[in-house]
């Protein structure tokens, strides 16, 4: 099996290399693609050095079986036909195709079978905040249908890419050395010692595109009529996102019911002993595959409401790992060989 990574030099592209090696993904060959800026860079995978090729409209994907793409929506839109025309399955990490009716949007723990119906040869990887939330909420939805969700996200700098992480570190350095921040390029404001209540562009209804994604993607993945109201916030941590989630179910659920369902849910680790200061934190979830969940409690304002706190590594489960799990499912069921 031949695998391609498009956007190999980025934060998610590099995570693809680590995860494919860690999980011993069944592949015989690897090819890396990137922009003019990245072409020529070399990376080691399983002891062998690979050079990044310039992504072009040619026959480079002729023998590729699976292509993981994480180079932005514009690149995905431009090169989708080039990538898939010889039969490669394109698993795309951008937002470009997520709401297209003929492109499945997949979280393997929830709707893996949707990946088998892909008329364009494309499978969309959901937004990181959506993935983390639905992995936790789907087992609860099986207990009683979730009608409404309110969520506030606390999203680290790495959600905006490797350059954004570097900018945050540079801002802290400038504050120590001069007392002022000079470098503000990847964020609309200084992020160091700050939080920014905007991720992505504002829409006409004053929700950001990130927040609208959570509404639409949750419905598509869970095959649900659930309504989600989100506030997405950038915080000055480097890696791992967190979310405070309130949800209303059709019937009241006890904390014990929820906790027991989550303990056996795939991709979830319950960390919930708040009386002893035990709860999920981004420092602890960074570098791990599971979504950590805790602070599970009844909502004081709604008898059918509960609330919880979750955190997870958005570069792993929120991006690269989820895509690799999709590919593993396709191989497992014999859809890709």
What annotation goes with each model-predicted range?
Residues 67, 157-337:
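Charged docking surfaces used in two-component/phosphorelay signaling
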Residues 1-191, 227, 260, 291-292, ...:
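N-terminal Rossmann-like NAD(P) cofactor-binding subdomain of oxidoreductases
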């Amino acid at each position: 099996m031949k695998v391609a990574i498009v956007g190999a030099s980025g934060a998610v592209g590099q995570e693809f290399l680590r995860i494919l090696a860690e999980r011993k993904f069944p592949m015989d060959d690897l090819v890396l693609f990137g922009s003019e800026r990245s072409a020529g860079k070399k990376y080691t995978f399983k002891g062998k050095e690979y050079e990044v090729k310039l992504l072009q409209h040619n026959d480079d994907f002729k023998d590729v079986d699976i292509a993981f793409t994480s180079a932005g929506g514009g690149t995905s839109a431009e090169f989708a036909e080039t990538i898939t025309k010889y039969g490669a399955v394109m698993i795309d990490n951008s937002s470009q195709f997520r709401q297209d009716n003929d492109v499945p949007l997949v979280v393997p723990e929830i709707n893996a079978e949707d990946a088998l119906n892909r008329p364009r040869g494309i499978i969309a990887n959901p937004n990181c905040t959506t993935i983390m939330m639905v992995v936790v909420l789907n087992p609860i939805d099986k207990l009683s249908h979730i009608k409404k969700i309110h969520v506030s996200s606390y999203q680290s700098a790495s959600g905006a890419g490797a350059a954004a992480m570097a900018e945050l570190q540079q801002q802290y350095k400038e504050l120590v050395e001069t007392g002022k921040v000079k470098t503000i390029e990847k964020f609309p404001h200084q992020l160091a010692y700050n939080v920014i209540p905007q991720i992505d562009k504002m829409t006409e209804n004053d929700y950001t595109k990130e927040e609208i994604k959570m509404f639409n993607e949750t419905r598509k993945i869970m095959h649900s009529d659930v309504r989600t109201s989100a506030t997405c916030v950038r915080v000055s941590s480097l890696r791992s996102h967190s979310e405070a989630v309130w949800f209303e179910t059709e019937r009241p659920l006890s904390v014990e019911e929820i906790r027991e369902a989550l303990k056996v849910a795939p991709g979830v680790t319950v960390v919930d002993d708040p009386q002893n200061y035990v709860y999920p934190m981004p420092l602890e979830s960074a570098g791990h595959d599971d979504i950590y969940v805790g602070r599970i409690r009844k909502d004081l304002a709604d008898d059918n409401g509960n609330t919880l706190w979750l955190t997870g590594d958005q570069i792993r489960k929120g991006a690269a790992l989820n895509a690799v799990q999709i590919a593993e499912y396709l191989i497992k069921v014999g859809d890709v060989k």
